[in-house]
Amino acid sequence: MVRGKYYKIIFFSFLILYSSFAQFVTEGVAEETVLITTDDGQKLKSTYFAPATSNAPGVILLPDTRCDRMNFGSIPRKLNEAGFAVLALDLRYKDIIAKARSRKEAISTIQKQDLMALVKYDTKSGINFLSSKKEVDPERIAIIGASLGSRVAIISGVEYDIKALVLISLSGEVAFPDYKPIKLLLSDYGEKPNLFMKAKRDWGGNGKAAEHNKLYYEWKNGKKELKIGSGSGHGVEILKKKESTKFVISWLKNNL
């Protein structure tokens, strides 16, 4: 009898473990590294996370000055596990920036590049890729941009009529030199949902990111939210914080 009881305990424990494993497999992440070719012939490495269901909303992740999608860490996977199709995209200047020996040098280097190419070619190609996926609803795509990525995102949001934008550590009066003011871009973006994020002590905009984001919030019409995280940080650092990740996932679910 005692031996029989142990067998039953072992058997049911096995069933529980098997069920948990089966659920993990069912809800697991289908991750694929893809090479996206832009209209001007550049080849961009990206990682695509397919959704578990059809007609899913999509999210494109645009990196910071480093132009490297890998700096998002586990964020793409967490977004995917929450039900989104996710494309994490490298930007064309990744290899150039990788040679910089400091953050200051990286910023100086990126400022000398053709930044509009990041909108006209890189982001456009990412949007086309994600929109073409049969499991993705092309009318429900959001862009999350961190630091430099937020500048690319706000212009792309207007240019390509993106459903929702998450702009992390955006700062300054203009997205790119000699381009439309951010105030005008926000007006052009219209009533569509926009989330502004920054840290309490964000070094963006020479320490004026907090002041700038409060202005953006005032300028924006329609659906908008301003999320100021505790402590210090900038761009991807903010998004990686557990509370920030949860907040963004919830916000996207409510606005896509």
Predicted regions, residues:
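N-terminal cap/lid segment of alpha/beta-hydrolase-fold proteins
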Residues: 23-53
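Short beta-strand element of the alpha/beta-hydrolase
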Residues: 56-64
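The serine-hydrolase catalytic nucleophile loop
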Residues: 65-77, 91
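Conserved alpha/beta-hydrolase
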Residues: 79-103
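Alpha/beta-hydrolase active-site loop
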Residues: 108-134
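Primarily recognizes the serine-hydrolase "nucleophile elbow" in alpha/beta-hydrolase
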Residues: 125-189
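The feature captures the conserved acid-bearing segment of alpha/beta-hydrolase catalytic domains
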Residues: 164, 171-228
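C-terminal catalytic histidine-bearing segment of alpha/beta-hydrolase fold enzymes
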Residues: 221-256
